[in-house]
Amino acid sequence: MGQAKYWHPYQMRSARLILVEDDAFTRATLGDALILQGFDVKARVATAAEALAAQAEHAPQVAVLDLDLGIGPTGIDVAIALRNKNPQIGIVFLTTYKDPRLIESNLPTLPEGAIYLNKLEMTSTSAIAGQVSSAMMKPLVRRSFPWVRNSPLSALSTLQIEIMKEIAEGASTSEIARSRGVSEQAIDKSISRISKHLGLPKSADSHQRVQIVRAFFENKGQGI
């Protein structure tokens, strides 16, 4: 593990930063907010290729990334690539997803020292700025993640997350069972366990599936 560099408070708030966010409105408003907080926002980009080009041009000290960048590499993939170029770059994820497995079940592990923030839980840009400063001051410190600490999703296995996602995409029990080469009874048991872990009330199968779909989108930050 590399030695953390000491940053003077003034240096922290004038740090070179790149913002990786595929939503144009969020990219513009968050970038402006971080500038007002004193950061030197060198680039606001939407894709992995643009992020790596911005790193090569500006040598940022910290990167703020969305998790879901649309089709192609995720924010985690981008963060890993940034770290490969600069092992000391601070990494902050700012996303609506309460658990990254809701994007893909086989995502790589978050880079060591990364800070994971939920957009819907942040109350001010100064709170975001404080976390960005922390990521830059101690880029490799071991951190716990929110879905591990206090989310009902933490009790779900990767397989259960996958089944939850398939239900949300409209797959029937028989379709899920067929695609996985198991019995419908096995999938029914998995659905019951998912409901129990999420704290959903017992109900008829159709209503149970509706509740799982609602929980899936709520945990993505896209409530229905």
What name fits each language-model region?
Residues 195-224:
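Basic, Lys/Arg-enriched C-terminal extension of HTH/homeodomain DNA-binding domains
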Residues 64-81, 98:
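Conserved phosphotransfer microenvironments
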Residues 145-192:
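Helix-turn-helix DNA-binding segment
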Residues 1-16, 148, 221-224:
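Non-catalytic signal-transmission and effector/linker regions of two-component phosphorelay proteins
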Residues 23-43:
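Two-component/phosphorelay signaling modules centered on CheY-like receiver
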